[in-house]
Amino acid sequence: MRKNRLFILATLIPCSLALSGCFLRNIIEPQQDDIVVDLPKIEVVNNLKINLQGRTTKSLYPVLSNNSVKNPEFSFTSSNNSVATVGSDGLVQGKAVGTTNISIVLKSNENVKTTVKVNVVDEVVNHYDYTIMFYMCASDLEYNSEKQESEQNHFFTQDIQEILSVHDIPDTVKILIETGGTLHWSMPSTSLEGASKISATNLQRWEVNNGTNKLRLVETLPYNQMASESSFSEFLSWGLDDYEADQMGVVMSGHGGGIAGCVYDDNYTTKVGNQLWQRTLRTFEVAGAAKTALANSNRDRFTWIGYDCCVMQVADIATINADYFDYMIASQENEIATGWNHDLYLPMIKNNTHVTPEVLLPEICDAFLLDNHREVETGEEICYQTQSVLDLSKADALVTSFNNLVNHLGVSAVAYNKAETAFKNSLNTFGDKIFGLCDFSSLLSKLQGVDPLLDVSEVKEAINDLVIYKNNCSKYSVEPCGVNAFFPKTLNSKYILQVGKEDYSNSLSTKFTKWQNMCVTYGRFGWDYI
């Protein structure tokens, strides 16, 4: 079975693995004159630009080139405080136009030092035609600690290399990447500028240098888990502050689990009872992060959000995202671990920097499905892959029509039992049936089957308006409609912690309030179903 981008909710990580790390070597002073000890190098951005008309503070987060010092501490000094000051935490504050040098010294060994040039300008902030921001939480898709190096797939390194393989992208297009979430990266140093490797112990922000087709390091940050609203909000603010464009796309890249959220960080776990769980970034946290970032920007919406993850094309998610994004692209089904084919759709932006989402996003769908069609043709494997595009301006109509339908169904134990029967009989269920997801149209048809008096036509029409493009190479007996419905199953459910009553009852989890009330009131959640 091929590896996919499905978020496994019940992943148990032994404490010994959670606490293990790299072997640390202390710097040992030579005992003889002829013994030479290679000092570590401080890796940090070589040049820092601060625009007084944009974000006037930026942080320096130096990293040692090896692990010779545990929890290294640095001192910072500005050569010209009238131009820019620097705090003990490395926060640089632009004051006036000019140039200053920031000296960075390792406190435990003053021979280890470097200098960063800071250029403070007062310029109109650059505006671009197109910016795509990749939030890459690589997890075990990049490095699996239980495998030998020869067995590693390095799927996220492959993703980045696909992006870099597209040459001659105009300077009016910016491709940004934040990296984190895994225990090790395998990106070759020859593809990087400003660092010898992608750090596994720090969050890092990069932009594609369109001239050299390399990743240029922009910022190195102290590690904060990627599956947090604050981390994601700061990422969005970075893009809005420094790379605002006519069109701005955001890509969530990592594992997905439907209503349970997306991206989980292998560097962070939460202990519940005797089990360790990776936390996810919930949909309401994605919305909260977008709200915060947009509030401090010159715009009120992003052009689109994409999920290069498993099973994220869910109606509940779409209704929440509709407040801050115009379009959404995702898969109803598990995605194969190789993810999107970036080298096949990016040329469309290269050739037309004003390409509309109605044209670009279907191209992403088709590029993703292309290799899967090839597998079907060669007979290697039956392909179960989907990808679809939603026009989120149509989401409110789906909310209204579905809430009206549930009103007719009734919020009661009897209604819940009807819904459960319909879900169990739905022809298309997704994510190995563990996430309570099924094709929305299929669920509606089955609901009408158990309650013939229900009229589902208005809801189906709303779905057809919402889904503006879909593609699949699946072998389902009925073609998926392009968006999933969520129903918390009562048996064999692994949502117990991640999406139990405490989570799905959250008023920010969905706009299908009638359906939500029925599921939370009459659904049976509990550990006994694992």
Predicted segment positions?
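N-terminal extension/subdomain marker
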Residues: 123-244
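Extracytoplasmic/secreted cell-surface and envelope-processing proteins
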Residues: 141-156, 184-188, 258-263, 312-317, ...
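Active-site groove signature of glycoside hydrolases
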Residues: 242-259
